[in-house]
Amino acid sequence: MTNIRKSHPLIKIINHSFIDLPAPSNISSWWNFGSLLGICLILQILTGLFLAMHYTSDTTTAFSSVTHICRDVNYGWIIRYLHANGASMFFICLFIHVGRGLYYGSYTFLETWNIGIILLFTVMATAFMGYVLPWGQMSFWGATVITNLLSAIPYIGTTLVEWIWGGFSVDKATLTRFFAFHFILPFIITALVVVHLLFLHETGSNNPSGIPSDMDKIPFHPYYTIKDILGLLLLILLLLTLVLFSPDLLGDPDNYTPANPLSTPPHIKPEWYFLFAYAILRSIPNKLGGVLALILSILILALIPTLHMSKQRSMMFRPLSQCVFWLLVADLLTLTWIGGQPVEHPYVIIGQLASILYFSLILIFMPLASTIENNLLKW
């Protein structure tokens, strides 16, 4: 009799995806982050569901409903902080996952890479709308500033912004629709993740050397299931340390003040994971130019397969490209720091230089380093 794992129509799909999946024998811990992202998504959906049971999406009661969750609901405080800091863990894993794809040339799987970019945009939209829901000062002003950027679109901008707001300012209608979208988007993300995996399993995983590994595969279970569990334990350790010792470390103190349209906070800034894009936005004095740079800072990922000039797939044996890659990482960290600073000297000029460097490294220096390395191979 055939094993039910291999014959049952539903279990068979799971078997081919997570159990009998042929995986390269040499993939490193940088390949753990895909599964960690899946865990983060499940955690966010579950904690979010329990929060939604007690949250009210009305401007008059939203702030106090979050306070009620933390004070009166059984273990509400831990659910709330797991959800808030879980988002930070999600983005840490996301950035490492994308960085891994860049470093090891995984972007040559075009469909998987492009679905990944769509996923990145969707997760960012979800996180932004989630940040608005507690209806604190930074929630309200963050929503006002970021949605207002759409008014830079010629001709239809102002109409579009008012359509998104559901009125002439960020108000009850905005909060209600943001809650609705924040609830539905994680399920759309889950569907996209399935498509992402479907395309990945068409080609099989990449590996650190970038060389096809068809002749050297091992089953996913038990080797990589055990390896993923280790990564998961470290993720849980980090998340629980954050939640139980310093839950507000990554938040903004202004968000503990209820939203007040008549009082602007001294420094409006988004959550830490958007600061790099926010710094790029602010570094351009023109509104439309800033918005375009903001979108392009992430959309540029779609150009990377086209900009791949190297004869080798991975950066494992390409020291020049490695230097450019780590410069890019350092530049993104600089942009993240600048995004959280006030708009004054010397932060403005540092932000502008870091923004120019960001686009230059991707568009000029990466292909240039690859071309030089190709020529060095001839010697």
Curated annotation (Swiss-Prot):
Q: Cite the binding residues for heme b b562.
A: 83, 182
- Entry GO CC: membrane; mitochondrial inner membrane; respiratory chain complex III
Q: What is the free-text note on the cofactor?
A: Binds 2 heme b groups non-covalently.
What residues does a ubiquinone bind to?
Answer: 201
Task: Enumerate the Gene3D superfamilies for this protein.
Answer: Cytochrome Bc1 Complex, Chain C
Give the record's keywords alphabetically. Electron transport, Heme, Iron, Membrane, Metal-binding, Mitochondrion, Mitochondrion inner membrane, Respiratory chain, Transmembrane, Transmembrane helix, Transport, Ubiquinone
Question: Which cofactor(s) does the record list?
Answer: heme b
Parts of the chain that traverse the membrane: 33-53, 77-98, 113-133, 178-198, 226-246, 288-308, 320-340, 347-367
Query: Which InterPro entries does the record cross-reference, listed alphabetically?
Result: Cyt_b/b6_C (IPR005798), Cyt_b/b6_C_sf (IPR036150), Cyt_b/b6_N (IPR005797), Cytb/b6-like_sf (IPR027387), Cytochrome_b (IPR030689), Cytochrome_b_C_euk/bac (IPR048260), Cytochrome_b_N_euk/bac (IPR048259), Di-haem_cyt_TM (IPR016174)
Q: Matching CDD domains, A to Z?
A: cytochrome_b_C, Cytochrome_b_N
Residue sites binding heme b b566 per the record? 97, 196
A Gene Ontology biological process annotation? mitochondrial electron transport, ubiquinol to cytochrome c
Question: A Gene Ontology molecular-function term?
Answer: metal ion binding
One matching Pfam family: Cytochrom_B_C
Superkingdom of the source?
Answer: Eukaryota
Cellular localisation: Mitochondrion inner membrane
Bilayer topology reads: Multi-pass membrane protein
Which family does the similarity line name? Belongs to the cytochrome b family.
Functional summary from the UniProt entry: Component of the ubiquinol-cytochrome c reductase complex (complex III or cytochrome b-c1 complex) that is part of the mitochondrial respiratory chain. The b-c1 complex mediates electron transfer from ubiquinol to cytochrome c. Contributes to the generation of a proton gradient across the mitochondrial membrane that is then used for ATP synthesis.
**Xref: PANTHER family:** CYTOCHROME B
Quaternary structure annotation from Swiss-Prot or TrEMBL? The cytochrome bc1 complex contains 11 subunits: 3 respiratory subunits (MT-CYB, CYC1 and UQCRFS1), 2 core proteins (UQCRC1 and UQCRC2) and 6 low-molecular weight proteins (UQCRH/QCR6, UQCRB/QCR7, UQCRQ/QCR8, UQCR10/QCR9, UQCR11/QCR10 and a cleavage product of UQCRFS1). This cytochrome bc1 complex then forms a dimer.
Q: Anything further noted? A: Heme 1 (or BL or b562) is low-potential and absorbs at about 562 nm, and heme 2 (or BH or b566) is high-potential and absorbs at about 566 nm.
Protein name as annotated: Cytochrome b
* Encoding gene (name): MT-CYB
